[in-house]
Amino acid sequence: VGYSYGSISNCYSSGTVIGDSNVGGLVGGKDSGAAISSSYFLIISGPDNGYGTSLTDTQMKQQSSFAGWDFFTIWDIVEGQAYPFFKSGVGTGTPDDPYRIATKADLLTMAADASYYNECYILTADINMEGQVFTTAIIAASDFTGTFDGNGHKITDFTINGGDDVGLFGQISFGGSVKNLGLENFSVSGSDDVKGLAGYSAGSISDCYSTGAVSGSGEVGGLVGYNENGCNISNCYSTSTVTGGDDATYLGGLVGDNEGTASNCYSTGTVTGGDNSYYLGGLVGDNEVTVNNCYSKSAVTGGYNSVFLGGLLGVNGGNISNCYSTGTVTGGNSSSCLGGLVGDNLGTGTVSNCYSTGAVIGGDGSAYIGGLVGYSYDGTTSSSYFLITSGPDNGNGTSLTDEQMKQQGSFVDWDFDYVWHICETTNYPKLIWQIVPGDFVCPDGVDFADYSFFAERWLNTDCASNNNCDGADLDLSGTVDIADLAIMCDYWLKGF
């Protein structure tokens, strides 16, 4: 400004100023009543006449130099690289107009201000954290009670070496929700409540996944460390490696300790505990409430004197229904309570309509080993089965041969219309939500057999009255056409 009669706040200038009189880096001159606050100029751009604060080039690239500025809704900065610039279309934090996060700088700015943790956010791009190392959860200043919508995007390449409650979020509290978010190529290590997404959650988590490495001593999960009562985790998965050292407890491929609900979820990573480790599960270390419509392919391994190891759950004190596990369960010498599905089914625990096929192996001196459940003290098991060669038949569950496991008639009282699917004589049962669009016929997976089925119904127009043309009308438009073919192509050679 050449001469100011009014007020100037939260402004800066960096261009060169040349003149003979009334020259300043920010303002040339001003009226006695004019105010200037929180405004700055580049020290080499022009004379410092006392109007505004001069900053070096390095200081101009540091957020901390600009006292009182709003770097959440108005300004943005790439630390060490650029001067402040205006955010573009950042939103207002409401459900209809969430704050938009497009860059690493946006995410770190949001994480730094806990006063906004009750607002709504949406990712508008994938974010690469560029290998940055943190010592706390990234979003950790307070409990998160807002909504964080990943919008189908992912956050990648970060490392956290901290204590308790570490992960992307430290704590998701009641009312908070995270959805549609992927976490990839990360490493998180800590003590208790350690995970990829949330150390502690009492909110809701849906349609999220993690593919990284997580390690800690207690309540360690590929996605969530501790899932509080009332929290629902749905349509999520983890392929992460979960590791605990000696004396580790509550390790799960998806959740370390579950006192909420997990549904339509799966895990395919590994869960490994050291000597004297307790509560190790392919999906959940300890379940006290509900797990349904889930599966695990995770291998579970414990060291010497490890206790409560299960292909799906280490310990179950709640309800498990319509679940299965296929991973190997291995305990070291003197281990106990090892089960293909559940290590220990407590008196309050129920297991219904489940099966397991993974081998259950205990070292020398191990006790309480079962193909389905390792040990059950007054727990209930119904309509649940295990592969006869996988582990001992201790009376918990019904053993089936490989041939019987591939026959629908073997699974008494199971719902093969809306819950389960089986390609008889070919595969063991799968949950119906696992069947991908375009997989019309057996065997499982979208291939030329399905294409032939689809071609026979090409351009049929009576789908609304014909069971959606036997399912070939994938977009439910009433006609089997190019739009349905495009959907089928998206899943080609998937679902096996």
Model-derived features: positions:
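Surface-exposed repetitive/solenoidal architectures
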Residues: 1-436
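Cellulosome-associated attachment modules in secreted, modular CAZymes
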Residues: 433-496
